[in-house]
Amino acid sequence: SDRHRIWYENLSYFSGFDLRGWEKKSQAKLAEESQLLIKGSRYLIIKGDLHSSKVSSENNRFVDRKIFGFLSELGIKENKIGRFQWDSRLIYYQDQIKLKNSDSEYASAYGIKNSWLRFIGKDGRIEGNIDYYFADGPSQIPPEALNGIANGETIKANITASILLGRSLSLNGTIFYLDNLRYNDFFKIQGEIRAHF
């Protein structure tokens, strides 16, 4: 069946513990997401938001800045309960960036993001995502802009697997890859064994 969600978020963060001066961040977002049935377990996904953020600090510890923009996503997902699930979306983000004592500049990003989940029997699962973005903006894009996407090309991939070993142990592993302007071919492998009592 079709589903529609509309929500509003307003967040504020204030820190006064740093001897160098206080720091204040605020964010507001009005968002909408629709899930429209195409056929069977396949859905059309439409998502968008209007957002703003503001960062200020004492003694100019950070460059005071304001951001106004929008986010849009369009894609298809398929949910087969207990089997293979996937979600693929095209994205376009745009932000207006206003730095203190500077003219407003614009930044935009487009790309595709894919996620999937596969159940392995009753006790295991493997899930992952592969994303590609291209952002075009000023040389120094604040981390709040474009949903955190860095300037230029970004390739990000993540695979996580978990399996239960009996009733008290689980084995988990993660492989993570990131390549963008900030991190050049960053690669991370992590594994853990958890005991449940």
Where would I find each of the regions flagged by the language model?
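Exposed, low-structure sequence patches enriched in small/polar residues
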Residues: S1-F197
